[in-house]
Amino acid sequence: MTENIKLTSFAAGGGCACKIPAGQLESAVEGLIGKADPNVLVGLDDGDDAAAVKIQDGLAVISTADFFTPMLNDPYDWGRVAAANALSDVYAMGGTPVTAINLVGWPNEKLGLDVLREVLRGGMDIATEAGISVTGGHSITAPEPLYGMAATGIVAPDKLMRNDAAEPGLPITLTKPIGVGILNNKHKATGEVSQAAVDSMTTLNREAARAAVEAGVRAATDVTGFGLLGHLYKLCRASGIAAELDFSAVPTIEGAKEALAEGFIPGGSRRNLDWVRPHLDTSLSEEELVLLADAQTSGGLLLIGEVPGYPVIGHTTERTGDAFIKA
């Protein structure tokens, strides 16, 4: 019976917090640029959310893949979160998803296929909500459960949002509150479910992306495993700018600050802060910085520009010193 399964006990990490640390990953892929192709609008250069390839005038294909180990004990909800997270990369580029395929790793001897079925059902329900079909997939046996999707989308090249197109002097908008990594860590340790976190992680970034494109935003990324600080740093670095954050304006999920005070801090969040700390100019406390670096799963969009209905959390600036982010 799937309701008695504690999925998080089958994995060392969970959600986007199980990513390879950013600094290590950058070392691994350094110099692996690939063949130059004028039709590749976004490729390997700046670690953007997805690839974008022009296939004809006025049309580009977006390609991305995302999968991870469970951050929730409920298999259906894990499937929903994983699918929303994978599709987020398409939305973060300003695109519209058109199809997705499942990516599965499964410890058959430890977990029944009835559990996997619930995971896949969750993913399919989110795909249906997004207006697309799940058209196939690939599976392997694995020591830990893994699930996600490879997603394909489309975008008009002149509407493409990318992480290297930010300019100074613009508002910074965040479309979801942060803190789900901390709450997921508490869930793994105690079994306590934060419905606010589940609701946030299973909310598609579709409407936020549409609003951003309509507002003329051209620089964006989504906030996932490297935390708000990490993804903002990557965007600033790729664009050659800096940013100032207003900590008091950053929205947080209900219960996240309390869970942080109780010590439920994911290792990935601490690694994120260690990675970005040399690029910070800050007077914030360590606890506040950990929250800003918290590894998000299926987080919101970080948009350079003001978008009606979503909070502004800072602004971009010229880069004049060593720091990329002032907070």
List each language-model region with its residue ranges.
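Small-aliphatic-rich amphipathic alpha-helix that forms the alpha element of a beta-alpha
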Residues: 75-101, 118-129, 204-215, 221, ...
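Glycine-rich anion-binding loops of enzyme active sites
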Residues: 55-72, 96-193, 315
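Acidic-glycine-rich active-site phosphate/pyrophosphate-binding loop
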Residues: 51-62, 202-208, 273-283
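N-terminal glycine-rich phosphate/pyrophosphate-binding loops that anchor nucleotide-derived ligands
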Residues: 1-92, 167-172, 318
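Glycine-/charge-enriched secondary-structure boundary and capping motifs
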Residues: 2-13, 24-27, 34, 108-133, ...
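A generic local secondary-structure boundary/capping motif
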Residues: 40-42, 50-53, 89-91, 124, ...
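Active-site glycine-rich loop that binds ribose-phosphate moieties when present
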Residues: 150-159, 192-213, 284
